[in-house]
């Protein structure tokens, strides 16, 4: 099963996305996979074929400002949660996704959850993979410093920050081939660093967390919470607290995984997601 690479222009912004389709016809709803910071849709490339093999088409975009998607100037794109939500809404409308299951991960996963809460009619099922889900969630220092005056401007222009951040969060080394993909946007243009800087500075986790906490208490769609027990940035207590507030949600922990479970434990993540989608 191959994963295709596509681009589409939405409101003058180029979106890059990956798409995996089952062989033959399938009546299953698509799965939309959203990545975190400073990751890319590439992080889902081992999961997508597994979904397709079981009949689930999947789409994984690079957020605006990340990967191979457009990296507009801050004067043209605010890099706030609302700006990301609006851009995502238009992307989904352009692809004519009427209803789908949503999988979110990491520190942009919160924006994906906000989208779901604001558009529940679109969401069949919701899976939350190691994302900030409460007002108490804080960016780890490794990410906080990327938004600091002067220091952040320098750090976000260093392609090796990808190595330090992804490996620091996952607690494992990534292969050189994988790191080459993640570094490439930073080597190609300074725009990648500027977009990352703007995103970190405008993430508004406290405000987002309040909206998420309130909204998920009323959430009706089936929900899966997946957490890496070795996540150094978002402890499993965050997931346990969310589960306590959502009695109908399912919590699955992965003993060996850190903040980016789909990177090193893609087979386990795939199995958990497929089991959830089938129920």
Regions found by a protein language model. Give the residues of each.
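N-terminal cap/lid segment of alpha/beta-hydrolase-fold proteins
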Residues: 1-14
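Conserved serine/cysteine hydrolase catalytic core
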Residues: 192-244, 253
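Glycine-rich nucleophile elbow surrounding the catalytic serine of serine-hydrolase chemistry
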Residues: 105-114
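Flexible "cap/lid" loop of the alpha/beta hydrolase fold
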Residues: 117, 124-156
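Conserved alpha/beta-hydrolase catalytic His-Asp/Glu region
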Residues: 139, 156-217
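Active-site loop/oxyanion-hole signature of alpha/beta-hydrolase fold enzymes
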Residues: 11, 18-21, 53, 60-104, ...
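Conserved HGGG/HGGXW glycine-rich cap/lid loop of the alpha/beta-hydrolase fold
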Residues: 20-68
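Catalytic active-site module of serine/aspartate enzymes centered on a nucleophile-bearing elbow/loop
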Residues: 249-279
């Amino acid at each position: 099963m191959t994963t295709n690479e596509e681009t589409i222009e939405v409101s003058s912004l180029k979106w890059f996305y990956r798409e995996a389709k089952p062989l033959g016809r399938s009546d299953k709803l698509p799965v939309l996979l959203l990545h975190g910071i400073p990751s890319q849709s590439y992080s889902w490339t081992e999961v997508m074929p597994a979904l397709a093999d079981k009949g689930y088409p999947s789409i994984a975009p690079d957020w605006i400002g990340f990967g191979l998607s457009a990296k507009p100037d801050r004067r043209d794109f605010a890099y706030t949660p609302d700006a990301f939500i609006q851009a995502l809404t238009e992307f989904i409308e352009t692809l004519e996704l009427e209803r789908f299951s949503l999988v979110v991960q990491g520190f942009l996963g919160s924006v994906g959850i906000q989208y779901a809460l604001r558009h529940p009619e679109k969401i069949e099922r919701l899976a939350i993979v190691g994302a900030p889900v409460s007002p108490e969630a804080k960016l780890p220092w490794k990410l906080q410093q990327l938004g600091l005056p002067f220091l952040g401007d320098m750090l976000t222009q260093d392609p090796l920050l990808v190595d330090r951040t992804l490996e620091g969060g996952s607690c494992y080394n990534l292969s050189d081939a994988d790191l080459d993909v993640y570094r490439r946007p930073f080597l190609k243009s300074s725009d990648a660093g500027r977009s990352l800087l703007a995103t970190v500075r405008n993430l508004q986790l406290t405000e987002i967390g309040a909206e998420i906490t309130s909204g998920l208490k009323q959430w009706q769609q089936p929900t899966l919470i997946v957490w890496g027990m070795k996540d150094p940035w978002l402890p499993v207590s965050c997931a346990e607290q969310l589960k306590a507030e959502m009695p109908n949600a399912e919590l699955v922990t992965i003993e060996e995984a850190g903040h980016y479970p789909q990177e090193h434990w893609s087979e386990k993540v795939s199995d958990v997601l497929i089991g959830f989608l089938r129920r």
